[in-house]
């Protein structure tokens, strides 16, 4: 497999943001970046958002080239929605622990063991899992989508068990959960969170629903990255403990410089485990190189793409 990281980084232009802007014009490209990307990438992106927002931007894109600064499943989603456009990912190794926790063959067997269930899959999954699903959801719209399903219709929810438990709690529905999780959101602990809050008693705890239940129980507000951003801007509080990947704090600080945003620490204080190692594989240098060389490019077999497109389109229609 060819990786952006395999290329030499010599002869890079001195002003990478300017060079990226020039390439964007030359290629008629649009740069989409997730909130968890490093600040330098966010600063050159055309659109910054969560999975739902970026899916909508990808669906509406009129550029010839979509450069996706995120992880592999996000770039796949852009390609599923835009088969006629070139979709580039700065580093093909930028995967996802949650997506990896749900192998297609095992999930197909799991689905077969639960006949008459519809499958709602979190967008953090591979194209193959999307193709096995009936509806896709994001952390922004998962509750809303489940609420639209008839109460007598049994549901499989995959692949994130923590988001699934949160949806069950919010909707009162019983869901059959696939046992997957995100390594970043599982690194937060209730004990470390309470210790931090004791040092910042006026801070509001805001958390992503991929966190485990004991952590969510301590949160004043639970929501997607976009919801966390909006809540922090509209809340009268001046200090927040942010329990998700800390890349989102860049946008929070830019939007509300008068407020203080404290990243929640991981359970293991010897590592930066609250940072997504896959998201951080993308760098400004790799972004430039992928645009310059127009690779690595996302490719999806057409049969898989068409099967994965239908549940994404259902999500977009149900969350309009």
Swiss-Prot record:
Residues annotated as binding iminosuccinate: 34, 51, 122-124, 139, 208-210, 225
Iron-sulfur is among the record's keywords: yes
Enzyme Commission code: 2.5.1.72
Cofactor(s) the protein needs: [4Fe-4S] cluster
Keyword Hydrolase: no
Cofactor note: Binds 1 [4Fe-4S] cluster per subunit.
EC primary class: transferase
Residues reported in the UniProt entry to bind [4Fe-4S] cluster: 96, 182, 276
One GO BP: 'de novo' NAD biosynthetic process from L-aspartate
Tree of life domain: Bacteria
Subcellular location field: Cytoplasm
Entry-linked InterPro entries: NadA, NadA_sf, Quinolinate_synth_type2
Keywords: 4Fe-4S, Cytoplasm, Iron, Iron-sulfur, Metal-binding, Pyridine nucleotide biosynthesis, Transferase
Subcellular location, principal: cytoplasm
GO molecular function: 4 iron, 4 sulfur cluster binding; metal ion binding; quinolinate synthetase A activity
Pathway(s) the chain acts in: Cofactor biosynthesis; NAD(+) biosynthesis; quinolinate from iminoaspartate: step 1/1
GO CC term, one of those recorded: cytosol
Transmembrane parts of this sequence: none
Substrates-to-products reaction catalysed: iminosuccinate + dihydroxyacetone phosphate = quinolinate + phosphate + 2 H2O + H(+)
Protein family membership: Belongs to the quinolinate synthase family. Type 2 subfamily.
Annotated function: Catalyzes the condensation of iminoaspartate with dihydroxyacetone phosphate to form quinolinate.
Entries under PANTHER family matching the protein: QUINOLINATE SYNTHASE, CHLOROPLASTIC, QUINOLINATE SYNTHETASE A
Protein name listed in UniProt: Quinolinate synthase
Organism, scientific name: Synechococcus elongatus (strain ATCC 33912 / PCC 7942 / FACHB-805) (Anacystis nidulans R2)
Name of encoding gene: nadA
């Amino acid at each position: 497999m060819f990786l952006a990281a395999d290329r030499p980084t010599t002869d890079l232009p001195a002003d990478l943001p300017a060079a990226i802007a020039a390439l964007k014009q030359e290629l008629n490209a649009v740069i989409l970046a997730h909130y968890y990307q490093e600040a330098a990438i966010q600063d050159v992106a055309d659109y910054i958002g969560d999975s739902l927002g970026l899916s909508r931007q990808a669906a509406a894109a009129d550029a010839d080239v979509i450069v996706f600064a995120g992880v592999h499943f996000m770039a796949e989603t852009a390609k599923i929605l835009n088969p006629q456009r070139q979709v580039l990912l700065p580093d093909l190794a930028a995967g996802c622990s949650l997506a990896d926790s749900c192998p297609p063959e095992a999930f197909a067997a799991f689905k077969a063991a639960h006949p008459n269930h519809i499958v709602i899959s979190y967008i953090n999954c591979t194209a193959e899992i999307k193709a096995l699903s009936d509806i896709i959801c994001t952390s922004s719209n998962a509750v809303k989508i489940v609420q639209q399903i008839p109460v007598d219709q049994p549901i499989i929810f995959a692949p994130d068990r923590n988001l699934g438990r949160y949806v069950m709690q919010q909707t009162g529905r019983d869901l059959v959960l696939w046992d997957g999780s995100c390594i970043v959101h599982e690194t937060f602990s209730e004990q470390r969170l309470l210790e931090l809050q004791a040092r910042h008693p006026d801070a509001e705890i805001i958390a992503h629903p991929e966190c485990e239940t004991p952590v969510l129980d301590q949160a004043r507000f639970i929501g997607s990255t976009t919801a966390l951003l909006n809540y922090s801007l509209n809340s009268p509080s001046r200090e927040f403990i942010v329990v998700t990947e800390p890349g989102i704090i860049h946008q929070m600080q830019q939007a509300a410089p008068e407020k203080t945003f404290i990243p929640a620490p991981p359970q293991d204080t010897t590592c930066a485990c609250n940072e997504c190692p896959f998201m951080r594989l993308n760098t400004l240098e790799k972004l430039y190189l992928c645009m310059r060389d127009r690779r690595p490019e996302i490719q999806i077999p057409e049969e898989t793409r068409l099967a994965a497109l239908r549940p994404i389109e259902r999500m977009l229609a149900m969350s309009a």
